[in-house]
Amino acid sequence: MNIIGLGQAGCNIAECFKQYSQYKVIKIDTGLEKAKGVYALEHQDKPEDYENKFPNLKRALLKGVNGQTLLITSCGFVSGASLHLLEQLKNKCQISVLYIKPDGSSLSKEKSLQDNLIFNVMQEYARSGVLERLYIVDNVKLSDIVGDTPVREYYNKINELISSTLHMINVFENSKAVMNTFSKPIDVARISTLGLVDYETEEEKMFFGLDMPREKRYYYAIPEDVL
């Protein structure tokens, strides 16, 4: 599976996937050091400039990228390139997007507008079938889940929570279950979130508050000696 981080938040989460051998990680942002799987964009002053000046990466960074691909991004200015990047990927991959919803109370007016734009467009892409799935996670809810954390470790904890949860879902999806009651997923229900559930109390901690979810899937990891 390919993991593409776009912008600072996306790249930081993508970096967490490097600890797992199942993923090919690509990072796209400004100020990145030259390395394999990395593309450093030129700094632009406006989000639309990142879209208008986004390079063609099909023959370089994206060469050989096909199959299941997850694009991770948020509302930073570099996210202005996300639609152009999806255009370059759409005929090569089965694309899903993980969108990190920021704390709206701390956003500037310009970033708030960018958040609304990208968030709404991604939802339309999911509903129209351009995306296999749109995962939405909310920084405010994630903050509540990780609890009291030293400032220096705050975003590291959140990024690790997101990446490890997604990784475990991929592991479950590609492992034979001892028992399952899954039905075929609803094809038109492509906007999703992630969450954790306490096995004993059944308390659910969702990463984003979806309006009227149409389907839920629960994965239980039970030690073999208990089975």
Show which residues each predicted segment covers.
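Tubulin/FtsZ superfamily GTPase core signature
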Residues: 1-227
